[in-house]
Each structure stands twice: as C-alpha cells, then as structure tokens.
C-alpha cells in the first residue's frame, strides 16, 4: 500500500473537507468521553434504586476520573513511539466495550469496574484526539478547528447531567452507557478507514518503570485528594499513608525519568517556559470548571430556590458563551498571538467568576446566567490558544507527550479542585452548624450530611441552613475567582513570541515547524512531514 500525501491548505478545513471525517470522528469520540464524565450525576438515584450500593456510588465518578487521568501521559508517549492511530483506536474500542459492560452491569461493584475500564479508554481519546488535530492541521487551520474541539468538550461536560436525567426519566439509566455503542462504533470505523500516518519504524526502549511509578503514584495522589475529607479525615492514618506514598512514588519517578533513554514523561515539559505556563494554566482551568459545575447548580436550587431545570439553564449560559468565543479565538490569535488572546480571555473569566462571587442570597437567575456567560466567553477565548501554543513549539515525535501532559494537568486540576473546594464548603458548613444562633441549638444538624434535611424542615432552621449553604458556596465562588487569577498569571508569564523548541537529539529530518508570520509560530500550507498524519486513508494500491 502506498501512502499518499495531502498538502495542507486553508481551503480544506471543515467537516465537509478531505479531513472532515477525521475531524468529525475525533469530535464525536471527544463528546462521548466528556459526556460520560458528568452524565451519570442525575441518574444516581435510578442506579441506586436498581443496583443498591448507595455508599459506593461516589466511586462511579472517582474511578472514571482516576483511571482516565493516570493513563493520559502513558498514551501520549505510546502515540509518539507507535503512532496516533493504533493508540486512538485502542482507546475508543476499550471505551465502547466498557460502555457495554456498564450497560449490562448487575451490581454496583460491577458498574464501578466498568467505569474504571471506561476511564482507561477515555484517557487515550482525551490525549490523542487533540494530538491528531495538531498533526493534520497547521496553526492557522487550528485557529478554527481547536475552537470546535474545545467547544465540544466544554458543552458536553456541562450538558451531561441534563442528558443523564432525560435518559433515566424516560428510558433507563442503562441507556446512558448503551448509547455510546453505535456512536463510538461510527467514530472507530471512520478513523480506521480515513485516518493514516507515516511512522518511522525503529527500535524503542519503553520506560516501563517510569510508567508504573507514574500511574500508581498519580492514582494514590488523586485517590487521596478525592476521598480526603469525605471517605476519611485529612489527618487520619489512611489519608497520611496514601498521600505520603504518592509523594514517595512520584519522587522516585522523577529519578527514573532522569536516567531513562525514552522517558514516558520527559522532565523538559516542566522546564520549558511555554510548556510550564501552559500546563499550570490547564491545571487551574480543570479546577475552575469542577468548582463551577459542582457547586453552582446546588447553590441555585438550595439558596435561590430555582428548579433543577432553571439551575441547569443558568450553568448552560457558560456553554453558550464558550463556543461563541472559541469560534472567534483563532482569528484573534493569528493577529495578536496566543498569549494576548488567552490573556483577554482569562481577564473576562476573572470578571465572570468575580461576578458570581459577588452574588448574594437574593440574586436573580439572570444575574447568575450573565456571570456564567461572561465566564464562558473568557474560557472560550483562552482554551484554544493555550493548547495550540504548546503543540506548535514541538515536532511530531514530541507532540503526543506535550498534548497528553497538558490534558493530564487539567485532570489533576479537577482532582485538586474537587478536594480544595470540598474542604472549603464542608469546613464552612461544619463551622456554622457547630455554633448556631440562640434559639436554634439542638435543631440545627450536627454534621454536614444533615444539610438537606435541615433545608426541608422549614422555618428558622431551614433559613439558617440556607444562609449557611450560601456562605459555603460563596467561599467556593471566591476560590474559583482566585483560580481564574492564577490562570491569568500563568498566561501573563508565557513568552510573548512562540518559537520552536530545540533539542539536542534533533536532526535535519525532524518536523519543520519553523515560526510562521506574526505570532502564530508556524507556517500554514505545508505538507505533512515524515512521521506525520495525512488525515485521510489513501486507496489501496
């Protein structure tokens, strides 16, 4: 079989272009894994009624996030060694198979195992999907395409709970997972038939020790952050043991990576300024999103008295602003550069999250929606330039690791954010319940788990619980605003001009990613290089 070469031109961008089927398949698979991170939230009551295991249901969320996060760096390295196609196809196949297992689950432990397998498949899709886009489109083309992909991720993540409620109310909670089968199969077939790449075959020394240390260490770190303060106290022996072991394993990992011939996560991704600042921004972005999506709907319902649908619409304003801004981000960063475009976006995100933090007990839903819309505009403007910036400074043989590291940082940020915001909310609630006003002693719940019951009592107890929940949510919203400021600082620290990074082991045959006109940092219209993806599968010869 001879492999054809497609010259990349701006005219061939879009779903109807030659590379359109590949773009559509990547967008579809990305939407599925993003939906599955949140879609089960509103179906939990139906799942528990059917399978039991109420005390175990939090693992449906934790285990998916955990296995997805820890596999991302490994997949990134494998994609740089063996190519994107086999890794991405493997990930989609595992995700679809695991979805079938989840749909047929006979018990809560079985469903948890299925969710773990889903996360293993999702890790490949999350990292390699973005990498494929970086391979088959130039920077100018990615101005539009990455906006599509960022919008798909953001919108799918936030709409997940709404779709989960529809499935569980009108069909069955099992269809939350079974619907992935035909859609995932379409993505799998399209990628197999239409996506090809040329990978230089040579002998590799896989960094097995590094992969094991990174996976186990990060698993324990995320586990400790997610379960600390809920499954066990932060100061308990279990919590200390888990976190100390995680730190020890990750320290050993850095030692191994310094000596590895082909490290699974090269330490230069933490030393190069453009990559370090991009990863810090991604980490903070992951925390910001989990804070808003987790606490804003609950606050709107319990404090403002909104219905579940109204609260969902308020949060959906973020998903409305995100794609609108993302569709224009590319045009903007081609004119003023990655850094400046992202900086404008994060300033808007700071304004939006600050507006949310300023909302009081008697805020109107339109005010909530307005602040979310501004935040969505800001995130839409900043997310695409950040990922394109880090991809554009390395060649094909390093783009998988760079992209995976950025996605990994966002996943770690989600776990850290969930832990920190949860600690803020729980500490505030516990403090207020421990010292109620005169006349309410004995009526106010003694622990945080009694918040829902207190809200349903009515009278002074319910009002105090409402005020307490507002205080807890207010603390979280302030923390999200601070997180947005962290993103702004990271973006401001990015280099003003994006240039190709140089490495000692590069040769003249490496990918030519010379800086292009203006701040974009790459020339449009070049043909794919050796070890690159054409974005289509040529006919058999």
Region locations from a protein language model:
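Alpha-helical transmembrane bundle and helix-membrane interface signal
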Residues: 138-139, 197-202, 222-240, 316
């Amino acid at each position: 079989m001879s492999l054809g070469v497609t010259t990349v031109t701006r005219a061939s961008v879009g779903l109807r272009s030659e590379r359109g089927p590949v773009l559509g398949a990547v967008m579809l698979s990305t939407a599925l894994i993003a939906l599955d991170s949140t879609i089960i939230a509103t179906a939990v009551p139906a799942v528990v009624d059917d399978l039991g295991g109420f005390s175990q249901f939090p693992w449906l969320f934790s285990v998916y996030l955990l296995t997805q996060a820890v596999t991302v760096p490994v997949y990134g390295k494998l994609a740089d060694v063996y190519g994107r196609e086999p890794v991405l196809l493997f990930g989609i196949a595992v995700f679809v198979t695991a979805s079938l297992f989840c749909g047929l689950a006979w018990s809560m432990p079985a469903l948890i195992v299925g969710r773990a397998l889903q996360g293993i498949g999702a890790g490949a899709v999350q990292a390699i999907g973005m990498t494929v886009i970086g391979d088959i489109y130039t920077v100018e083309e990615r101005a539009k395409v990455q906006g599509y992909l960022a919008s798909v991720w953001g919108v799918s993540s936030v709409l997940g709970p709404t779709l989960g409620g529809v499935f569980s109310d009108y069909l069955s909670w099992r269809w939350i997972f079974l619907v992935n089968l035909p859609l995932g199969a379409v993505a799998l077939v399209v990628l197999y038939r239409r996506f090809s790449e040329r990978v230089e075959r040579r002998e590799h020394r896989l960094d097995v020790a590094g992969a094991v240390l990174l996976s186990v260490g990060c698993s324990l770190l995320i586990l400790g952050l997610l379960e600390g303060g809920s499954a066990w106290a932060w100061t308990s022996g279990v919590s200390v043991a888990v976190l100390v072991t995680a730190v020890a394993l990750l320290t050993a990992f850095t030692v191994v990576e310094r000596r590895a011939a082909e490290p699974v996560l090269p330490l230069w991704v933490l030393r190069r300024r453009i990559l370090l600042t991009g990863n810090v921004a991604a980490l903070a972005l992951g925390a910001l999103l989990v804070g808003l999506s987790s606490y804003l709907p609950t606050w709107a319902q319990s404090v403002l008295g909104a219905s579940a649908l109204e609260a969902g619409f308020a949060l959906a304003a973020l998903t409305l602003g995100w794609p609108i801004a993302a569709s224009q981000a590319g045009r903007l960063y081609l004119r003023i550069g990655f850094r400046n475009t992202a900086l404008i976006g994060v300033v808007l995100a700071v304004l939006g999250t600050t507006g949310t933090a300023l909302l009081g007990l008697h805020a109107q839903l339109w005010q909530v929606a307005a602040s979310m819309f501004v935040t969505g505009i800001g995130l839409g403007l900043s997310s695409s330039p950040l990922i394109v910036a880090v991809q554009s400074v390395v060649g094909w043989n390093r783009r998988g690791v760079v992209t995976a590291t950025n996605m990994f940082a966002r996943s770690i940020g989600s776990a850290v954010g969930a832990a920190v915001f949860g600690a803020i909310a729980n500490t505030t609630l516990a403090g207020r319940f421990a010292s109620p006003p005169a006349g309410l002693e004995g009526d106010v719940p003694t622990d945080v788990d009694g918040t829902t019951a207190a809200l349903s009592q009515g009278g002074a107890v319910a009002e105090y619980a409402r005020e307490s929940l507002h205080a807890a949510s207010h603390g979280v919203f302030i923390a999200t605003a601070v997180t947005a400021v962290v993103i702004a600082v990271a973006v401001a620290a990015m280099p003003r001009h994006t240039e190709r990074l140089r490495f000692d082991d590069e040769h003249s045959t490496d990918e030519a990613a010379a800086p292009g006109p203006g701040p974009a940092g790459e020339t449009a219209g070049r043909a794919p290089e050796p070890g690159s993806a054409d974005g289509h599968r040529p006919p058999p010869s």
